[in-house]
């Protein structure tokens, strides 16, 4: 795939061509062009981003995005400008969140590529160890590793990825060194709310799924999928107040969720999922609401180098939970430019993203266009009620334990 040239690169090519024909002309205009190049770069680096507004009585703010791929042409941009450059337009959203998740669409390689056994497939993605530290510094708190590229460089690549995440102290879901490890659920206390995060993939090649002895990803086998979600919500097991499920599913470049996606989504909500975040198609798919569970079938790419218009359309979701249990989700339309996600300003582009996000949405869903985003309203009182009930039980358990210690001490 040929990368689109930047304004600066086009100018440099123009200079080279003109220099051969008219060196004297170049000597005159070269200083002026140098000023233009510097100014253009400065504008790109310092372009203002709208501040993120917090609502009153917010309990927590969570941000969720789609596929993150920091290799190939994105790596060239990072090498030139730094990682901050890639996230510069969305940094306020990431930094002003209590929880940030996305799909990490490649393994981390700690050695030269020749030391790895490539998977039998056409496209192989990879990233360097510093990428994990970079996404953590950008604001991500947990990432999904269950996807069709995690085993691109074999078992060794998957193990290196897990090692890199552990060394960076960044939580991950959906991949592990064996079947027991891959079923790990991440529990995080987010402003008093116990949030469980899970990750599964329905897109994989032979040998990519974790077994008793082999590292890999966690598949969307319905038996395992639904048991894991129920476990996360069960008061006697995970006891989570809010359950977020990452799903790598659907068909690539298909902007409509498949019947399988729709059936699995409803089954997941019935099992206890509150938020389902889909990725893999590389294009946007509509969201839907089922029994107050929110389903984003595909948020498309987030950081990627694909050049097709539909693969450059993206969205960022911010989940705001209020103290009274009202959940408001802001869906911010984005467009990917030079690998970097940027909030859309053109009315035409906004409407294209809005249309794609809502064309298959059920009629009963409560949503509206507000300011520069879609706003979705949900009744998530059950999350607050579960949190209060859990806190009360934890307090009672603590008191009983302290009383028991006191009795043992006095006797």
UniProtKB/Swiss-Prot annotation:
Query: Looking at the keywords, is Transmembrane present?
Result: yes
Question: Could you tell me which residues belong to the region Disordered?
Answer: 386-411
Q: What induces it?
A: Capsule synthesis is transcriptionally regulated by AtxA, AcpA and AcpB.
Q: Which UniProt keywords apply?
A: Capsule biogenesis/degradation, Cell membrane, Membrane, Plasmid, Transmembrane, Transmembrane helix, Virulence
- Keyword Transcription assigned to the entry: answer is no
- The positions making up the signal sequence are none
Any Gene Ontology CC annotation: plasma membrane
- Where does this protein chiefly localize? membrane
Matching entries from InterPro entries are given as:
Capsule_synth_CapA (IPR019079), CW_Biosynth-Accessory (IPR052169), Metallo-depent_PP-like (IPR029052)
Membrane topology classification: Single-pass membrane protein
Transmembrane stretches, by residue range? 25-44
Biased composition (Basic and acidic residues) is annotated at 386-403
Its biological function?
Essential for the synthesis of the polyglutamate capsule of B.anthracis which is one of the principal virulence factors during anthrax infection. May form a polyglutamyl synthetase complex together with proteins CapB and CapC.
Q: Which family does it belong to?
A: Belongs to the CapA family.
What is the designated name of this protein? Capsule biosynthesis protein CapA
In which organism is this protein found? Bacillus anthracis
Q: Supply the gene name.
A: capA
């Amino acid at each position: 795939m040929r990368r689109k040239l930047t304004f600066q690169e086009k100018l440099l090519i123009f200079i080279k061509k003109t220099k051969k024909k008219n060196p004297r002309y170049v000597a005159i205009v070269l200083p002026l062009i140098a000023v233009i190049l510097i100014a253009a770069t400065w504008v790109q680096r310092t372009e203002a981003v709208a501040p993120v507004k917090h609502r009153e009585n917010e309990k927590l703010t969570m941000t969720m995005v789609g596929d993150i791929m920091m290799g190939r042409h994105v790596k060239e941009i990072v090498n030139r400008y730094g990682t901050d450059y890639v996230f510069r337009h969305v940094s306020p959203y990431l930094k002003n969140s209590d929880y940030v998740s996305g799909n990490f669409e490649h393994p981390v390689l700690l050695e030269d590529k020749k030391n790895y056994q490539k998977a039998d497939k056409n496209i192989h993605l990879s990233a360097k160890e510093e990428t994990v530290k970079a996404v953590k510094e950008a604001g991500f708190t947990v990432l999904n590793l269950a996807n069709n590229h995690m085993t691109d460089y074999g078992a060794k690549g998957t193990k290196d990825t897990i090692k890199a995440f552990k060394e960076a102290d960044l939580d991950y879901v959906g991949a592990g060194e064996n079947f027991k490890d891959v079923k790990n659920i991440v529990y995080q206390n987010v402003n008093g709310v116990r949030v469980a995060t899970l990750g599964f993939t329905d897109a994989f090649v032979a040998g990519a799924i974790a077994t008793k002895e082999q590292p890999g990803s966690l598949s969307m086998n319905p038996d395992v999928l639904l048991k894991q979600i129920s476990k996360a919500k069960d008061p006697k097991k995970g006891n989570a107040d809010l359950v977020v499920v990452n799903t790598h599913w659907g068909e690539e470049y298909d902007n409509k969720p498949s019947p399988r996606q729709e059936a699995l989504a409803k089954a997941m909500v019935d099992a206890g999922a509150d938020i389902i975040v889909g990725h893999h198609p590389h294009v946007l798919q509509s969201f839907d609401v089922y029994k107050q569970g929110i389903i984003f079938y595909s948020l498309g790419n987030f950081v990627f180098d694909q050049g097709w218009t539909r693969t450059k359309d993206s969205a960022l979701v911010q989940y705001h939970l209020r103290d009274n249990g009202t959940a408001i989700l802001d869906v911010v339309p984005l467009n990917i430019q030079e690998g970097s996600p940027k909030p859309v300003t053109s009315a035409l582009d906004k409407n294209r993203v809005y249309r794609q996000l809502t064309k298959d949405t059920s009629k009963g869903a409560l949503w509206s266009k507000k300011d520069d985003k879609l706003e979705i309203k949900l009744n998530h009182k059950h999350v607050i009620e579960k949190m209060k009930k859990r806190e009360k039980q934890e307090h009672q358990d603590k008191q009983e334990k302290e009383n028991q210690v006191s009795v043992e001490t006095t006797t």
